[in-house]
Amino acid sequence: MRTSQYLLSTLKETPADAEVISHQLMLRAGMIRKLASGLYTWLPTGVRVLKKVENIVREEMNNAGAIEVSMPVVQPADLWQESGRWEQYGPELLRFVDRGERPFVLGPTHEEVITDLIRNELSSYKQLPLNFYQIQTKFRDEVRPRFGVMRSREFLMKDAYSFHTSQESLQETYDAMYAAYSKIFSRMGLDFRAVQADTGSIGGSASHEFQVLAQSGEDDVVFSDTSDYAANIELAEAIAPKEPRAAATQEMTLVDTPNAKTIAELVEQFNLPIEKTVKTLLVKAVEGSSFPQVALLVRGDHELNEVKAEKLPQVASPLTFATEEEIRAVVKAGPGSLGPVNMPIPVVIDRTVAAMSDFAAGANIDGKHYFGINWDRDVATPEVADIRNVVAGDPSPDGQGRLLIKRGIEVGHIFQLGTKYSEALKASVQGEDGRNQILTMGCYGIGVTRVVAAAIEQNYDERGIVWPDAIAPFQVAILPMNMHKSFRVQELAEKLYSELRAQGIEVLLDDRKERPGVMFADMELIGIPHTIVLGDRNLDNDDIEYKYRRNGEKQLIKTGDIVEYLVKQIKG
């Protein structure tokens, strides 16, 4: 490709509305342009990267035995009504009617469509297992699209769905998809972790997320410094302290704390160690309970894990925190003065709280706290559960090492769905025993457009993008200095361009009448891994300057050796 016949569209300045580095660099490198909130046009450089990602995904899915299909983005509402998700899905589901007043949706996912297809196409267990995938546009009407293509409304996704007659068969395909995803992200040159995850609204019995590690990530990824243990922070177990609870050394005293409405204020004003404080959060109880709320207690420096809390049988789902008005109606005190002593509703305490002694907590009286509280002396030990987020340094749940926490960007997610959708849509086949058998399902997603942004978040410097070789828009840039004035530079540039292309290498020849500084800046901005610079001075010695984008190292290579050298660097 020649720049004179290409839309490069680079920008010198960073657009003001671009928050994260991937959004900034995708705009500056001429990869995308915003059409409307959460909607982007992909320009030629962006499409080239997108196709590289797609091709790797497609190759590994095919290698894993998955079969490619293509399903419509527009889906009839009756399928969503049949599955129950018409009511369950929020405003992210874009609903509309056609000219015949028939309701439809723009698909955010395709479980209903694929299950409808399978219930009409398959009849016998002998046809299974099967795993279907597509690379297709999705639409989710995000309330606040942000971070460019990282959280856009329209995006490209690889979604796969497998069908089975047994859990054992599902597990085999699940393991194959886990391995395929690991190959996909490894081939792309990404630093990632596969982590245990909560199944969330999708449901099912098992789930793993594939997280690209990056400072800008929205998720906390937890992993052991010693073993292979890794989990999303929502799922990571906080192990109970091994040390027995220390004996009481203080009497419980009621203390006036009129200006301490938060743990931070309590600690500062009374010079308390934060590890000796407990915070109490009230959430709504499950419908039909004899009590309106449940009190959840975690140590002052810990955070409540809302996913774990929501799984408590006495807690309503979705998890809903009580308002101040609701709290006062039950406890007769505000949210800054709550604690376990004389709490009139059920209490659940975190494992760490159960091991505490001589601690401070609200007295359930406005402006007052109890200091020196001890379990079983001042208040009975209530139900104990793991309800907090882990913190760095906690013991790993597998008993090996300590936990580290890094930020991650979710680029893939695999689920064992079970029979949730097949039961709702009555998808079954004749089993081996001749009886009707509901199908067991798995689903497996990769955010293709998100992968592009995540790769940039992990691979950039002050000059621009530093693409991993496998997904770079071009492999080699040829920069001929003053080619329009120097015949030998022009002749060599054309010769190398032809020879490299004949070797199957993707080349961008910068044949613009531009200053060298502009040419260098553009090639570094768009992140082409290998650059060769042709100039009369070096050619006097039969040399060509080669530069590797990732480390910035330069070297002189003889003109007769440069093609072989580049082929070796790129193809190994």
From Swiss-Prot:
One of its GO terms (biological process) is prolyl-tRNA aminoacylation. One of its GO terms (cellular component) is cytosol. The keyword Aminoacyl-tRNA synthetase applies. Keywords: Aminoacyl-tRNA synthetase, ATP-binding, Cytoplasm, Ligase, Nucleotide-binding, Protein biosynthesis. It comes from the Bacteria. GO terms for molecular function: Ala-tRNA(Pro) deacylase activity; ATP binding; proline-tRNA ligase activity. The keyword ATP-binding applies. Changing T257A: Reduces the posttransfer editing activity 5-fold, with little change in both the aminoacylation and the pretransfer editing activities. Its main location: cytoplasm. Its EC number is 6.1.1.15. Changing K279A: Severely affects the posttransfer editing activity, with little change in both the aminoacylation and the pretransfer editing activities. It catalyses: tRNA(Pro) + L-proline + ATP = L-prolyl-tRNA(Pro) + AMP + diphosphate. InterPro entries: aa-tRNA-synt_IIb, aa-tRNA-synth_II, aa-tRNA-synth_II/BPL/LPL, Anticodon-bd, Anticodon-bd_dom_sf, Pro-tRNA-ligase_IIa, Pro-tRNA-synth_IIa_bac-type, Pro-tRNA-Synthase_IIa_type1. CDD domains: ProRS-INS, ProRS_anticodon_short, ProRS_core_prok. Pfam families: HGTP_anticodon, tRNA-synt_2b, tRNA_edit. It is found in: Cytoplasm. NCBIfam families: PRK09194.1 (NF006625), proS_fam_II (TIGR00409). HAMAP family: Pro_tRNA_synth_type1 (MF_01569). Homodimer. Catalyzes the attachment of proline to tRNA(Pro) in a two-step reaction: proline is first activated by ATP to form Pro-AMP and then transferred to the acceptor end of tRNA(Pro). As ProRS can inadvertently accommodate and process non-cognate amino acids such as alanine and cysteine, to avoid such errors it has two additional distinct editing activities against alanine. One activity is designated as 'pretransfer' editing and involves the tRNA(Pro)-independent hydrolysis of activated Ala-AMP. Belongs to the class-II aminoacyl-tRNA synthetase family. ProS type 1 subfamily. Consists of three domains: the N-terminal catalytic domain, the editing domain and the C-terminal anticodon-binding domain. This is Proline--tRNA ligase. It comes from Escherichia coli (strain K12). The gene is proS.
